UniProtKB/Swiss-Prot annotation:
This is 2Fe-2S ferredoxin. It comes from the Bacteria. Binds 1 [2Fe-2S] cluster. It comes from Buchnera aphidicola subsp. Acyrthosiphon pisum (strain APS). Ferredoxin are iron-sulfur proteins that transfer electrons in a wide variety of metabolic reactions.
Length: 111
């Protein structure tokens, strides 16, 4: 079973939490199951950037990203080359480390 290490966050997570994950589930699913209150304004439909996270380890073990996710990420605060939407990033077989940015933009697109 892969493990997800959520790194400390000033408001949401005072200390790191390591969680077990199932291959094939999203980072957001793991966070919510472990009571990490990661925002997700669009209810996991890839229409906002509130669940933006930065993958510090294991980026290439996650599923590939879609053009839609890439477009939404362009609007995320603090975008980095290892940024993903946690509702879209599907966990593979390797352990990952996730940083939750201090801020997010509640930018939503209606399709």
């Amino acid at each position: 079973m892969p493990k997800v290490l959520f790194l400390p966050h000033k408001i949401l997570l005072p200390k790191s939490i390591e969680c077990e994950a199932q291959t094939g589930e999203t980072i957001l699913t793991v966070a919510l199951r472990n009571n990490i209150k990661l925002e997700h304004a669009c209810e996991q439909s890839c229409a906002c950037s509130t669940c933006h996270c930065i993958i510090k380890k294991g980026f290439f073990s996650l599923s590939g990203w879609s053009e839609k996710e890439d477009d939404i990420l362009d609007k995320a605060w603090g975008l980095q080359s290892e940024s993903r939407l946690s509702c879209q990033a599907v966990i593979g077989k390797s352990d990952i480390e996730v940083e939750i940015p201090l801020y997010n933009l509640n930018y939503t697109v209606e399709y």
